């Protein structure tokens, strides 16, 4: 985008719903409550009473898989599994973890995020900026520690003398073992799941996200060296299309993978 035509910084100033990109935090909460990567859970039709009405979440592909593992539920981004997890674990626990990861959740009011749909499927009231979502994923990439984003690491003068150092705060959000297991699960998103188009050909982990009406598409991912987020969307929040084709999170993943390959050209491959 041309800054002269539009000075809006979409990385830091525009909030959009994260969709399924919120799910790793739900699954992390599940691990903390005793679930394991191979724990069985049934992908089936479920109904919940929400604001006096029955709500039945749908899977993006319209099918039900029966009994699957927790990992498969994340890798294939199964909505019914995410909703069941929030309902079982408890809205308050998932809400707290999302807040600790840095998501700007709305706690009260007519519209708030203390509900199954906002927490399980990412239909957040205010949404998130790409920077906020990237920062939330640092809890997975940094073994449970959330890193505060900084615009610079150091400032030097013309002679190389240090003038100022960027302060990067960090705090523990997840136990080390939870972050480790989440990374292993999220690696499979890129090798056999919804993010396979973004596989950069080296160890990487991440998650896709798409919102209702195909108005926003996300991919948030990381390697041992770098974490990056791709957001696709229009300023008027209209559906994503290009050349008559619908764009989705697969396209976001593909762009992410291309960036990672270029950014890490010549960097030795290493595992998590």
Residues of each region from the PLM?
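Active-site catalytic microenvironments for nucleophilic, acid-base chemistry
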Residues: 29-34, 88, 100, 139-143, ...
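Conserved catalytic neighborhood of penicillin-recognizing serine enzymes
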Residues: 35-94, 146, 158-188
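A penicillin-recognizing enzyme superfamily signal
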Residues: 1-12, 17, 22, 72-76, ...
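Mid-domain, small-residue-enriched loop/turn segments at the edges of structured enzyme/sensor domains
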Residues: 54-59, 90-135, 148-151
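Short, glycine-/polar-rich solvent-exposed loops and beta-turns at beta-strand/coil boundaries
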Residues: 41, 110-115, 197-200, 271-272
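Short, solvent-exposed beta-strand edge segments and adjacent coil->beta transition regions
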Residues: 13, 80-82, 116-118
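Thr-Gly-centered strand-to-loop micro-motif
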Residues: 84-85, 123, 206-208
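Periplasmic/cell-envelope proteins involved in peptidoglycan metabolism and beta-lactam response
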Residues: 1-24, 28, 33-39, 92-100, ...
